[in-house]
Amino acid sequence: MQEKSCVFMGAIPTGALFFMRLENAFLLSNKGDIIEIISQYDNLENDLIAWCRFKGENFQKKFSLKNNNSTYFAYVMQKQSPTKFTKFNPDSTLSPIHQGLAPNGSSIELASPKYHFPLNNKNEIWGNNLEQIYEESKKMQWNATTDILWSEIPSLDSTLEFATAQIMTYLTENEFSALYIPSRFLAQISPFFTPIPLVLSSIIGDEGRHIESFIKRANATGLGVQYSTLTTQQSLYSLWNEKDYFKSSFLLHVMGEGTFIDLLRFLEKCFENLGDLQTAKLLNLARRDETRHVAYGMNHIKSTISQNPSKIAILKDAVFKRKNYLESQNDESSLLLESMAILAGGSETKISSGFESVLELKKKMEKNRTKRLMECGIDEDLARDLSRSHTPNFM
């Protein structure tokens, strides 16, 4: 359908500004459209005819316009050159090859550079409630320096302090994993799917804040971070080494961080019982963030499975492949479990009762993992098998 646009030049003489506006009027028009220039000058016809010939456009006519006591002149031209911009297609499941770094909704000029975004299929990366998750991430921001009253952290006995520092070391390692993995995939997702890079950027910001906070807590009473065990290193390496976004999102956000929020809640209660309310608050704030990350992962996996149920087999393969790798290495981090048992018991003398609490936590983790997997669209029997096959190192 032919459209008409009008550019009011008024007293602008022919020159750089005049022809810039004229160029833009033609640039944004489609082939066959009419462009009308309104000017107070009546001697532009020859210049515009010459410009149209040079540009491959068509000058049609000139006529006068009278408005009260003023006289203006209209110069009518038609665009003969090809349309320069593609029309935005909101229903496309594939990002346009020329999308570049333009946001969703943009019309892209033809012949723009081709960026290679490997993750360019909506059916494989999308999830519901992305905007809501992103909005919540902005509302729930907190400051690790000012929102935690570090001076109010109590002094615990040396055994509890070591257990705390060791646990914070472990938490920090896990958060580095949760920082780097989304960062790797962020640059692979086309801006055509604008909400996803925004959500991932919020996740990355959250993880950076958690890393800062856990290190500060380890340093709060002078011990600092402690030991990084081979078991933890290998478990996180098997997570970090996954190069497929769908598998990685499942292993990290659903299986890993889903288990992690149960761990954070357990630790939060431990510190509440010890009277360390600021550390409990820190863990609560981190858990609140992690809950959003799990929601994103579950929405992503659920959406993808609903589009293609056969992808459940891919997730099954990823879980058992990781399980087989870890079984050939070490099992659990005994140093972490002992630290958790001491913390849960409240002292080294009550480590036995604390260890029972840790065992109950592991049962709860397995039950909650199974529930999350079923919510993603996986049948109960397989969900239970996958949950039981998850790394005993929590993440």
Language-model segments: residues:
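Active-site-proximal alpha-helical scaffolds that flank and shape metal-associated catalytic sites
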Residues: 216-288, 321
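C-terminal edge-of-domain segments
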Residues: 58-81
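Alpha-helical transition-metal enzyme core signature, strongest for iron centers
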Residues: 52, 171-179, 200-218, 253-264, ...
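Short, structured protein-protein interaction patches enriched in aromatics and acidic/basic residues
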Residues: 38-58
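Short glycine-rich, basic-tinged beta-strand/loop micro-motifs
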Residues: 27-39
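An N-terminal amphipathic alpha-helical segment
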Residues: 1-29
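Terminal targeting/low-complexity segments that flank the catalytic cores of oxidoreductases
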Residues: 21, 83-198, 219-225, 231-232, ...
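C-terminal helix-coil-helix/basic helical segment that borders enzyme active sites and/or dimer interfaces
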Residues: 299-309
